[in-house]
Amino acid sequence: MSTKKVYSFLSQAFIFSAIMLISNIIATHLPIPMPSSVIGLVILFSLLCLKVIKLEQVESLGTALTGIIGFLFVPSGISVINSLGVMGQYFVQILTVIVVATVILLAVTGLFAQFILGKDKKETEDTKELKVVNKGRKHGKVA
């Protein structure tokens, strides 16, 4: 393995580690329980959108982690199996939360998609109208 690849991997691992450290610190100080991994994803997304971090700086390690994502779920699966007693005790409540959250998620996603598509449709109509007006001006038909 070339030295450049090793340094690239180490720099990507450092970026991910720094983001996770920051997200862990934030999670411990939040008044509501929120997983540090979710906070880390939001931080990484924000840094990528703001172009503080370039995609090339984290892409290959991110791709490698995505490739082994199934393996990364093993500890979560073991935790679920260890918690089956608690889950059985609160089965109805857990099932209710899952169903309600799924319905809310589907509704919000659908409404948001309709909003975006409606906005896109309006922009398309406005663009067509503007082209017609500009075309008329070129031919001296519109004052």
Curated annotation (Swiss-Prot):
One of its GO terms (cellular component) is plasma membrane. Keywords: Cell membrane, Cytolysis, Membrane, Transmembrane, Transmembrane helix. InterPro entries: Antiholin-like_LrgA, LrgA/CidA. One of its GO terms (biological process) is killing of cells of another organism. It is a multi-pass membrane protein. It is found in: Cell membrane. Pfam families: LrgA (PF03788). The chain crosses the membrane at residues 6-26, 30-50, 61-81, 97-117. It comes from the Bacteria. Belongs to the CidA/LrgA family. LrgA subfamily. Inhibits the expression or activity of extracellular murein hydrolases by interacting, possibly with LrgB, with the holin-like protein CidA. The LrgAB and CidA proteins may affect the proton motive force of the membrane. May be involved in programmed cell death (PCD), possibly triggering PCD in response to antibiotics and environmental stresses. This is Antiholin-like protein LrgA. It comes from Bacillus cereus (strain AH187). The gene is lrgA.
